Amino acid sequence: MATMSADLGAPVSWAGGISMVISAGTIVSALMSDRMTLRFGAGKVTAISVALTALALFGFSMAPSYWVLILFAVPYGLGAGGVDAALNNYVAIHYESHHMSWLHAMWGIGALTGPYIMGYALNAGQGWSWGYRYISILQIVLTAILIFSLPLWKQRVPQPQSIETEPSADITEQSAAEGLAQEPSREPLGIRGVLAIRGAREILIMFFCYCALEQTAMLWASSYMALGKGIDKTTAAMWASLFCIGITVGRLLSGFVTMKFNDPTMIRMGQVLVLLGVVVMLLPLPQHLGTIVGLMVVGLGCAPIYPCVIHSTPTYFGEDKSQAIVGMQMACAYVGSMCMPPVFGLIAQHVTIILFPWYLVVFLVLMIVMHESLRRKCGGQRIG
């Protein structure tokens, strides 16, 4: 970002404006996902959304000024929110929980790969513009793959799901046969319609809390280690990356664990691991071992929560309502990710950064309360 700032003649602090525009776009497109998917289908929405991100990234690479970056941040945000909502709901309906976990593990791998691609471009003397260009080329290739695969999207039938037990073979065959039937036409659910559904508020607050916890840990872990624990800044940044590694590795592993346990159990196991990680962070172990190990355990605990909450949504609320609810989940995720880390920044500045673990606990406790309330209201039955 410092290199871009010098080339574009814009202060580094203005990067926050780009992030705000992207976040606003993701929220808008996530809220529109039910309407768009009903009209065009999940495959087309996903392909168009990825194409928008490819266009935006190529635009970033050609941007001569800060304001052009702002302009291309709009399609980037719209595309990111669209693909998140449409693809997550499609996978939740048509695939099993381990597929969802591995899908989100790929997000972690992508998030770790992106900086390396940018670093390669900078080290090769090609500049930051080529870093964005390389990534845009990958997105263009992905768009082409999605377009050619559109006929395959129509061939999938919904996976029979149950929160409590595995379905019998007869139920599986019946559900598969029903999945081939044409879905009856309906009006898209608006925000009020979603909020009126029993249990929807709980699952939305869960998502807000999870993403607030994850993003706060991701953005403030290194500062907590450096300023709160006295660890060298370079070392702190290295150890803080264990959180992201924990999430990615955890999702790869939890994909196998979901073959044994259902989604609510996976969510509870993740919550217990997050709590255990925070407790370890607070232990006065030598060489800051508690902070380092605890942070990685928190990452491992976060791993199954996000994908399992999404995958359980059609089971709780029905496939006819899940797209609208998943879209709202994505919107809540972006709001939590965008708003809550800065709130902790104010706490760190005006009180103390030592409160970092306790800040995570607040969101964890609220998440647990909402999950148990959701289970009491909806149980293992679909809400009609």
Where are these regions (language model features)?
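Conserved MFS/SLC helix-loop-helix module at the cytosolic interface between two early adjacent transmembrane helices
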Residues: 28-67
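A late C-terminal transmembrane helix in Major Facilitator Superfamily
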Residues: 316-353
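Extracytoplasmic gate region of multi-pass secondary transporters
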Residues: 197-241, 245-249
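Cytoplasmic helix-loop-helix junction between adjacent transmembrane helices
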Residues: 72-106
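C-terminal transmembrane helical hairpin of 12-TM major facilitator-type secondary transporters
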Residues: 261-309
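Helix-breaking motifs and short loop linkers at transmembrane-helix boundaries and internal kinks
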Residues: 9, 41, 62-67, 230, ...
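Symmetry-related core transmembrane helices of the 12-TM Major Facilitator Superfamily/SLC fold
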Residues: 130-151, 355-373
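Helix-to-loop junctions at the C-terminal end of transmembrane segments
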Residues: 29-41, 251-263, 348
